């Protein structure tokens, strides 16, 4: 599995693109807020010929979901996350005002609910969703046993 890390937005947060030899990929936490960040993510995916199969969120705090509408528009992907965090989507506009800015795009609803133990497959790679409530009630980490790595 190959990994590309981006650091996005004013908070900042990490976004990961994971892919394997099949060029199937997942994007984790697309926190791209600024237009140049969105273009950097899109350009990387396009230039590497990646076929993004899943958009995964570790949790749904504001800084981790900025790019979800962009991913839906550009790649037709709805986010996958734990249902216990879904309320954060409705809170996003209010949260952004608390931090002194407006969202550029309205948050989009989740496409799939992930649960503890769910397996996400892309190409020949498998990630296990592990529910780790604490930072947020629906926090998930994604573990790749074959490569001994975890994304949180």
Give the positions of each predicted feature.
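Short Pro/Gly-enriched beta-strand edge/turn motifs at strand-loop
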Residues: 1-2, 99-102, 123-127
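Conserved beta-strand hairpin/beta-sheet module of binuclear metal-dependent hydrolase folds
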Residues: 1-48, 141-152
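Short, well-ordered secondary-structure micro-motifs
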Residues: 16, 91-93, 124, 142
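Divalent metal-coordination and catalytic microenvironments
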Residues: 18, 29, 59, 71, ...
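Short, glycine/acidic-enriched loop or turn micro-motifs at the edges of active sites
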Residues: 23, 32, 62, 85, ...
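Hydrophobic "anchor" residues on beta-strands that sit immediately upstream
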Residues: 25, 55, 78, 131, ...
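Active-site HxH/HxHxD metal-binding segment of metal-dependent hydrolases
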Residues: 33-38, 42-121
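Core dinuclear metal-dependent hydrolase active-site scaffold
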Residues: 118-144
């Amino acid at each position: 599995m190959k990994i590309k890390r981006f650091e996005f937005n004013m908070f900042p947060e990490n976004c990961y693109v994971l892919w394997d030899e099949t060029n199937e990929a997942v994007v984790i936490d697309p926190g791209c807020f600024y237009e140049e960040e969105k273009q950097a993510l899109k350009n990387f995916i396009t230039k590497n010929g990646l076929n993004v199969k899943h958009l995964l969120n570790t949790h749904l705090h504001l800084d981790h979901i900025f790019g979800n509408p962009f991913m839906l528009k550009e790649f037709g992907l709805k986010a996958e996350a734990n249902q216990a965090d879904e309320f954060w989507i409705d809170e996003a506009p209010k949260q952004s005002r608390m931090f002194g800015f407006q969202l550029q795009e309205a948050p989009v609803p989740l496409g799939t609910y992930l649960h503890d133990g769910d397996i996400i497959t892309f190409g020949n790679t498998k990630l296990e969703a592990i529910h780790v409530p604490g930072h947020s009630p629906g926090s998930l980490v994604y573990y790749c046993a074959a490569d001994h790595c975890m994304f949180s």
